[in-house]
Structure formats: C-alpha cells, structure tokens
Amino acid sequence: MDYVVSVHASEELDDDNLTILDLENILLIGEIVERQRDLQTRERKFVVRGATLDGFEAEAIVKFGALGNLFIITVYLV
C-alpha cells in the first residue's frame, strides 16, 4: 500500500502510543464509516474505523492524493 502520513497524523500516533503497524492494521481491516467533503478544498475524505494490533478501536481520516496514493490526515483512538 502506497501512503503518506501527515505530520499531524505522526504526532497523533505518538500521542496515543500507536505505531505505524497499528495504523496499517486500522486501514487494512477497518471499514469506511463516513464520507466527508472538505469545505475549503472540496476534496473527499474518508473516516476509516478499525482496530490497533492490541485490539483498541481507532479511526483514521484519509484522502486520496493527486497521484492516487493514500494520504493519512490524522489517526486517533475512539
């Protein structure tokens, strides 16, 4: 999977003591629970709810970049 993690998402991972493997698990086994549209850019964003490797429920907010890669906006425990 080709993805880019924003600085904000990286900081949130650290704040919640999550690893990049937790993020990948959220994305790979999670499901899209909400579709959003950014009010300024009109880009589509998706809320993906899944579980960390330790089984904690978490969400990632993602969008697709211009080159088709996945851009991780933020991630947090639910």
Where are the predicted features?
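Ribonuclease/tRNase effector modules and their secretory precursors
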Residues: 1-78
